[in-house]
Swiss-Prot record:
Region (Disordered): 1-27
Record motif 'KMSKS' region, residues: 299-303
HAMAP family: MshC
A GO CC term attached to the entry: cytosol
Keyword annotations from UniProtKB, A to Z: ATP-binding, Ligase, Metal-binding, Nucleotide-binding, Zinc
Lineage of the organism: Bacteria, Bacillati, Actinomycetota, Actinomycetes, Micrococcales
Protein name: L-cysteine:1D-myo-inositol 2-amino-2-deoxy-alpha-D-glucopyranoside ligase
Length: 438
């Protein structure tokens, strides 16, 4: 599947410190250090394309864009993979509601997502993979788990006639995965509280454990389906899709599994369990999660409809750089509520930064300093903030102080020093924050 066009990312004039982030599975701030000689594998769960990109989505993809940029700034080559869940229940239900074919709806929303990501200057994935593309790998993985005894069949009495002679859904047997719970560290009671609301089927008759995740759904009338060989006609479950896409395009364990914190359980927990069932290996070395963005007292959600859409803000004439700055003003691990005041503050900040960059570049004292190396103290401070658990608000404050020094009352050596930093600040703001100061 085609991705979008990546922004140009300038190289810093120094090698930044490697990023440290909060690892959900470890419950601690942990350095992201690729294994010697290996790329930094980054997998970020993508959209289910039944509606447009809202600011909760954008915040997540921006957080992992910071991870990507921080790893690159530290000298690590990055291989970034993202999936698209281009067949799933929410997509099918929305297509039926709207009277359009599910493939048409998915295609339209995927293109809108690409446009939003390009406008926000998110570095594009090296592999952008639809779930449908990965079905052959899903089938092979599910068959392997059945053969090893780590998956089992549950008869599907309501299956379509073409689902096979003995149609069945297939489930992972979590009792065969002793590491289950290694990502979330939740209790079974905590898991059960959200399992049904997050795509699980705890009341499915015939399951060995109510939390066992669906691997293969036998074909039902009116649902899209694919040939699964000995599995019969059907389609894969949600979690196995990411498991196989990540394994095929990154290998396991890769460095970082990322997503919103509503994916900690069941999605990332199940992806890890399925990988253990397949290979006995870890799925990822680190799990990093973005907190929810709310609106009107609830998390922003396509199912609830309380959305601020990136595409609508762009259509209204908002500068995507201001949208990006508004999201960067909040730390990724802090849940927060969007208001118009965030965007207004971001507009003002962007204008001030660009004015400072223009003023510093045009200043006679800057011209006098052209023979001297450009200063990089501010750029280094900015890089330090991003390396410290993606402290974007702290990074913005660093640039704010520089802009104040350029545009304020200071004269003499202090003002000249701030103006001499202009080139380094422009480069670092672009490379690390993804903001072009013009």
């Amino acid at each position: 599947m085609d991705s979008w066009t990546s922004p140009d990312v300038p190289a810093l004039p120094f090698t930044a410190e490697g990023p440290r982030v909060h690892d959900t599975a470890r419950g601690a701030i942990t350095p992201l250090t690729p294994r010697p000689g290996q790329e930094a594998g980054l997998y970020v769960c993508g959209i289910t394309p039944y509606d447009a990109t809202h600011l909760g989505h954008a915040a997540t993809y921006l957080t992992f864009d910071l991870v990507n940029r921080a790893l690159r700034a530290a000298g690590h080559p990055v291989r970034f993979v993202q999936n698209v869940t281009d067949v799933d229940e929410p997509l099918l239900e929305r297509a039926e509601r709207d009277g359009v074919h599910w493939e048409e709806l998915a295609s339209r929303e995927i293109q809108l997502f690409r446009d939003d990501m390009a406008a926000l200057r998110i570095i594009a994935p090296d592999a952008y993979v639809g779930a449908v593309e990965g079905i052959p790998s899903d089938v092979a993985a599910i068959r392997a788990m059945l053969e090893s005894g780590r998956a089992y069949r549950v008869p599907a009495e309501d299956a379509a006639a073409d689902a096979g002679e003995s149609p069945a859904d297939v489930y992972l047997d979590l009792a065969q995965v002793p590491t289950f719970g290694e990502v979330s560290h939740w209790t079974p009671t905590q898991m059960m509280e959200v399992f049904a609301d997050r795509g699980g089927d705890p009341d499915r008759a015939g399951k060995r454990d109510r939390l066992d995740p669906l691997l293969w759904r036998a074909h039902r009338e009116g649902e899209p389906h694919w040939e699964g060989g000995s599995l019969g006609a059907g389609r894969p479950g949600w979690h196995i899709e990411c498991t196989t896409i990540a394994r095929d395009h990154l290998g396991t364990p890769f460095l970082v599994q990322g997503g919103g914190d509503d994916l900690v359980f069941p999605h990332h927990e199940m992806s890890a369990a399925q990988t253990r069932a397949l290979t006995d290996d870890a799925f990822a070395e680190h799990y990093v999660h973005q907190a929810m963005v709310g609106l009107d007292g609830e998390k922003m959600s396509k199912s609830k409809g309380n959305l601020v859409l990136v595409s609508r803000l762009r259509a209204a004439g908002e500068d995507p750089a201001a949208i990006r700055l508004a999201l960067l003003s909040q730390h990724y691990r802090t849940a927060w509520e969007w208001t118009d005041a965030h965007l207004e503050a971001a507009r003002q900040r962007l204008d001030r930064w660009r004015h400072a960059a223009q003023t510093a570049t045009a200043s006679p004292s800057t011209a006098d300093a052209e023979d001297a190396p450009a200063g990089d103290a501010v750029a280094r401070q900015l890089a330090e903030r991003i390396a410290d658990d993606l402290d974007a608000p702290g990074a913005l404050a660093v640039v704010d102080r520089w802009a104040d020094a350029v545009l304020g009352e200071q004269t003499g050596a202090a003002a000249a020093a701030a103006r001499a930093e202009a080139r380094g600040v422009r480069t670092a703001v672009d490379a690390l924050l993804g903001i072009d100061l013009g």
